[in-house]
């Protein structure tokens, strides 16, 4: 009978106790599996089922083939401590069961509970790296199909648009260039060959059908942009230039020898008239005819001259306002002319004469409009230009001056821009300045004998008057006297000193449009004074 020492019993007792404790501690391990289950609920969609459903119990069952059950940390420490005590004691031979358990404990040390917990940061790190990768979620096969379908429908919608012309700004591309990607090629071909259910969603597109990429169909709808108010062509727009076939331009009196002839104002003829001048509505009655040269003089008793003209910076009366138009120009040229007019800060509606000039130059192009605007600005700096004064005021300025004195003023006739008032044989006469195609003249055909500048016309007439009369004037009535015309003494408005109030208004009106005066930070009385007709 074999003897069993006390030390051997103690060792057997300790091993059995640790084995019982190990069996008891196994109950805590399912909590680890539940912890991993929480992570799987968050990231499990990115991995397979085998990785998402991993748990500790499955590993314990696999390890149970080599050992009875897993052991806890406390049981492992106790076994290692007992193993050290065995090596120190070296007394007695351990039992076979205890040796097998020690061998199992040392060999299974890398996969004990402490090492199992180390797998969690490794797995979470892989999840984090996957979550923040450049392509975290792989595209499903349906995504590429949907992309191709959406692009196909978009292209078909663009083809449905209302016939975009080649002049439209847009990127054009053949449909076969759109199919360069292999992912969408098969889907596009299938959509081409497939029949449409509703008849509008799909089109059978050929390979070389041009389509518009990047713009919606409404971007290619052609529409006409309306022009600004006042620039529409007028239907039956009237001309303000006298027709050469008009009977009032035909003279029955032969021209005088020694030069051209001018008609003059005969105040006595008007005084002999019994009928009031307001009856003569026709301009051919109120105006006296020039000779064969076609220069028009104004009658001093004309009914329309009783109404004072407006200032160059004042708009015309509402009942006589003429709508500005550039019907003779193309769309681009009319826009250039209007832009140039606004850029020069000059309003063609400001005065009767200035407004009418724009109608006469509408067929001459924007350069004529620009040159005319600059010429009118240059004219305002001349001393002999008196602006919007009436014929009665002009006669008052020329009352006590010698023959050859003259001044230029705004014409009160709707068909003309400027008028010339001059002295001849002790009388004050008036004639209008013709304008056509950017040229100014005293005669009917300014294209032949005219000047591009009003200042040049007056200066040229002054030089011609040094050697005598450069032309003659006469009345339209047969047998009327003829008067020589000389321009030698310009009457300057700068020679008369006006009040400070008048000069201030003159400067303000030079740099401020009439429609902007109400916006000036001035009292209402001063605004009314600035808006008076004459200055």
From Swiss-Prot:
Gene Ontology biological process terms, A to Z: intracellular signal transduction; negative regulation of signal transduction; negative regulation of T cell activation; phosphatidylinositol phosphate biosynthetic process; proteasomal protein catabolic process; protein ubiquitination; regulation of growth
Superkingdom of origin organism: Eukaryota
GO terms under cellular component: immunological synapse; phosphatidylinositol 3-kinase complex
Region: Disordered, residue numbers: 80-105
Entries under Pfam families matching the protein: SH2 (PF00017), SOCS_box (PF07525)
Key words, A-Z: Growth regulation, SH2 domain, Signal transduction inhibitor, Ubl conjugation pathway
The keyword Glycoprotein appears for this protein: no
GO molecular function: 1-phosphatidylinositol-3-kinase regulator activity
Domain SOCS box residues, every copy: 486-535
Keyword tRNA processing tagged: no
InterPro entries in the cross-refs: SH2, SH2_dom_sf, SOCS6_SH2, SOCS6_SOCS, SOCS_box, SOCS_box-like_dom_sf
Pathway: Protein modification; protein ubiquitination
SH2 domain segment(s): 384-491
Bias-annotated ranges (Basic residues): 80-89
Oligomer status and interactors: Interacts with RBCK1. Interacts with phosphorylated IRS4. Interacts with KIT (phosphorylated). Interacts with PIM3.
Record's function text: SOCS family proteins form part of a classical negative feedback system that regulates cytokine signal transduction. May be a substrate recognition component of a SCF-like ECS (Elongin BC-CUL2/5-SOCS-box protein) E3 ubiquitin-protein ligase complex which mediates the ubiquitination and subsequent proteasomal degradation of target proteins. Regulates KIT degradation by ubiquitination of the tyrosine-phosphorylated receptor.
UniProt note: domains: The SOCS box domain mediates the interaction with the Elongin BC complex, an adapter module in different E3 ubiquitin ligase complexes.
Protein's name in the database: Suppressor of cytokine signaling 6
Gene from which this protein is expressed: SOCS6
